[in-house]
């Protein structure tokens, strides 16, 4: 049985938008959406790609299996550790 991975992005900037677009086009991947501390930015990136804008990190982590952390660097560690603690596969944009 083939598993569809639910993927999402933390951070709605340039890098987050790039990762979101790549997830949305991959076969075997369902693009869940984007979490950003500014929900309107998350919506701007997620909605055209068929994803949701998440207003809180916990809800976002409940909706994904795989996450890219592409937020400002000062938030990387905390967000990545939260995703790891939630059992998610995590890719962190540099710097880690």
Which role fits each region the language model picked out?
Residues 1-49:
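N-terminal Rossmann-like dinucleotide-binding module
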Residues 19, 49-96:
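Beta-loop-alpha module in the N-terminal Rossmann-like domain of NAD(P)-dependent dehydrogenases
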């Amino acid at each position: 049985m083939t598993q569809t991975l639910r993927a999402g992005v933390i951070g709605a900037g340039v890098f987050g938008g790039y990762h979101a677009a790549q997830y949305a086009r991959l076969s075997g991947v369902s693009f869940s959406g984007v979490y950003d501390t500014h929900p309107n930015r998350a919506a701007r990136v997620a909605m055209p790609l068929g994803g949701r804008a998440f207003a809180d990190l916990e809800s976002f982590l409940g909706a994904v299996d795989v996450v890219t952390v592409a937020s400002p660097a000062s938030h990387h560690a905390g967000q990545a550790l939260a995703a790891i603690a939630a059992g998610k596969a995590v890719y962190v944009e540099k710097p880690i």
